[in-house]
Amino acid sequence: MDFYYMPGGGGCRTVIMVAKALGLELNKKLLNTMEGEQLKPEFVKLNPQHTIPTLVDNGFSIWESRAIAVYLVEKYGKDDYLLPNDPKKRAVINQRLYFDMGTLYESFAKYYYPLFRTGKPGSDEDLKRIETAFGFLDTFLEGQEYVAGDQLTVADIAILSTVSTFEVSEFDFSKYSNVSRWYDNAKKVTPGWDENWEGLMAMKALFDARKLAAK
């Protein structure tokens, strides 16, 4: 299956880790969005929104990292690994995935993306959004090992990608003890962590270069 990506992209790293956990080989196709390669007609035909990551599995095209992750587990996963069949457990996983997209990662984007354009982060209010999001995550993890219950799921992998992005961006979340505990464990038990970290280093290099250029 073809996988269009950039190594540093948070969503791209999520899919890579999920594929690794499932034992799937991705035919990785580097797409340089900085050069506008996502706007080429052949790619827009696959994904009208021209975003990454995008997966093409035997002619079926799907994008948005969390949708890709769930698709891969539903099609190729075994038993209840990464995505239990129980409706209540799955509902909690879905809630955590939506939380990651709409609250946790969104708070990162609001505060850190301006660094790419101006060399300065977002406002104090934007920083408070990050603190609020981590407070929620810390509460979710109270008394449990994983973000959506007692086993590793796609929600852990997606949120691991996001939290590790905060780490390399030098956001200190050590005061959130449950998050710190979970993060230390998740790094050890999640397949593909090493490749996630390699992608983060690529992201950090780009991040640092943009900050310097914006000064």
Swiss-Prot record:
Keyword Transferase on entry: yes
Role noted for this protein: Conjugation of reduced glutathione to a wide number of exogenous and endogenous hydrophobic electrophiles. May be involved in detoxification.
UniProt domain GST N-terminal: residue ranges: 1-80
Residues annotated as binding glutathione: H50, T51, I52, E64, S65, R66
Presence of the UniProt keyword Transmembrane helix in the record: no
Family: Belongs to the GST superfamily. Delta family.
GO cellular component, one term: cytoplasm
Gene Ontology molecular function: glutathione peroxidase activity; glutathione transferase activity
This enzyme's EC code(s): 2.5.1.18
Domain of life: Eukaryota
Name of the top EC class for this enzyme: transferase
Organism: Drosophila melanogaster
UniProt xrefs under SUPFAM superfamilies: GST C-terminal domain-like, Thioredoxin-like
All residue ranges annotated as the GST C-terminal domain in the record: 86-212
Pfam families: GST_C, GST_N
Subunit-structure text: Homodimer.
Reaction(s) this enzyme catalyzes, per UniProt: RX + glutathione = an S-substituted glutathione + a halide anion + H(+)
Gene name as annotated: GstD2
Protein name in UniProt: Glutathione S-transferase D2
A Gene Ontology BP annotation from the UniProt entry: glutathione metabolic process
Alphabetical keyword list: Detoxification, Transferase
